[in-house]
């Protein structure tokens, strides 16, 4: 039987904290004999403030979260799909990128989300992906 684990966490703007939480959940899934692990969208960090994101986001090569997950994939010989993480592709441009990592810790492929959406959930909770 092929087992898939979907990790669920509530990311915030602390990439180190999110990596720690994700790593613990991945190891827990591995102990339950999973074969393939999937993390949620914006696993690495979450913020509605684009200026803040531009300060903390980096390229794929320098992304602390991505590099940490690659090490786990290699160490435990598991394929991991990062639902998405925010990657800086230029001084003022971010992308919401899904990344597939193989069991040797190498990136096999990635996909940049292109279907942005805007939603107003309440007076206080509003998301405007189209402005990122």
Model-derived features: where do they sit?
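Active-site-proximal beta-strand elements of phosphoester/diester hydrolases
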Residues: 1-13, 18, 38, 97, ...
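Active-site beta-strand/loop signature of hydrolases that rely on acidic residues for catalysis
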Residues: 4, 18, 22, 26-56, ...
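Catalytic metal-binding/acid-base residues of hydrolase active sites
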Residues: 10, 43, 85-86
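Feature marks short, surface-exposed loop/turn motifs that line or immediately flank catalytic pockets
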Residues: 13, 43-46, 117
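Active-site catalytic loop in hydrolytic enzyme cores
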Residues: 89-132
């Amino acid at each position: 039987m092929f087992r898939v684990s979907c990790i669920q966490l509530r990311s915030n703007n602390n990439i180190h904290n999110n990596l720690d939480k994700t790593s613990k959940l991945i190891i827990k899934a591995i102990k339950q004999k999973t074969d393939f692990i999937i993390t949620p969208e914006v696993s690495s960090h979450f913020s509605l403030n684009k200026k803040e994101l531009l300060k903390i986001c980096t390229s794929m090569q320098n992304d602390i979260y991505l590099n940490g997950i690659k090490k786990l994939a290699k160490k435990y010989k598991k394929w991991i799909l990062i639902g998405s993480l925010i990657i800086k592709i230029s001084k003022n441009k971010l992308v919401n990128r899904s990344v597939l990592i193989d069991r040797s810790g190498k990136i096999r492929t990635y996909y940049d989300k292109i279907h942005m959406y805007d939603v107003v959930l309440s007076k206080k909770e509003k998301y405007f992906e189209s402005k990122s």
